[in-house]
Amino acid sequence: MFPTVTEFMNYGQQTVRAARYIGQGFMITLSHANRLPVTIQYPYEKLITSERFRGRIHFEFDKCIACEVCVRVCPIDLPVVDWKLETDIRKKRLLNYSIDFGICIFCGNCVEYCPTNCLSMTEEYELSTYDRHELNYNQIALGRLPMSIIDDYTIRTILNLPEIKT
């Protein structure tokens, strides 16, 4: 007789424990019900990137002194710098500067260590193409400033600010 009573008590304890676990899960589900959705409708809504966002690199041809510091600090030796030594003034003259964004890891070392600040990171992150050779940008393509997301009237911008808990 006692084994049946203890089995019945164990069954009751297990039932109460299971109901408590289901209740805890249900409370978590209800706490998420009143939050705003995380998903954005991408082509029509875009997040405003932070100031420190590392997007496409912008290059200013006139400031570059062809010192090749960007090539030396790049972990994959990516920027291609072609220059010619001007013997009469004994300075390097920049001929071509290009970066292949299909290979670039967007680490930002080239921007950080550039002595003349001719490189900067932009907020542009839409670099998708159908041909990978289109990701090889020369100094003309790198010199174009991207259109700001904030200025585009066809796109609804969403601030990407962390929630402040009070």
UniProtKB/Swiss-Prot annotation:
Enzyme Commission number(s) from the entry: 7.1.1.-
Record-level GO cellular component terms: chloroplast thylakoid membrane
Signal peptide coordinates: none
Topology in the lipid bilayer: Peripheral membrane protein
Function: NDH shuttles electrons from NAD(P)H:plastoquinone, via FMN and iron-sulfur (Fe-S) centers, to quinones in the photosynthetic chain and possibly in a chloroplast respiratory chain. The immediate electron acceptor for the enzyme in this species is believed to be plastoquinone. Couples the redox reaction to proton translocation, and thus conserves the redox energy in a proton gradient.
GO annotation, biological process: photosynthesis, light reaction
Catalytic activity, reaction form: a plastoquinone + NADH + (n+1) H(+)(in) = a plastoquinol + NAD(+) + n H(+)(out); a plastoquinone + NADPH + (n+1) H(+)(in) = a plastoquinol + NADP(+) + n H(+)(out)
Keywords: 4Fe-4S, Chloroplast, Iron, Iron-sulfur, Membrane, Metal-binding, NAD, NADP, Plastid, Plastoquinone, Quinone, Repeat, Thylakoid, Translocase
InterPro entries with a match to the protein in the record: 4Fe4S_Fe-S-bd, 4Fe4S_Fe_S_CS, NADH_quinone_OxRdtase_chainI, NDHI
Family: Belongs to the complex I 23 kDa subunit family.
All residue ranges annotated as the 4Fe-4S ferredoxin-type domain in the record: 55-84, 95-124
GO molecular function, one term: iron ion binding
Binding site for [4Fe-4S] cluster 2: 74, 104, 107, 110
Name this protein carries in UniProt: NAD(P)H-quinone oxidoreductase subunit I, chloroplastic
Subcellular location: Plastid, Chloroplast thylakoid membrane
Cofactor(s) listed: [4Fe-4S] cluster
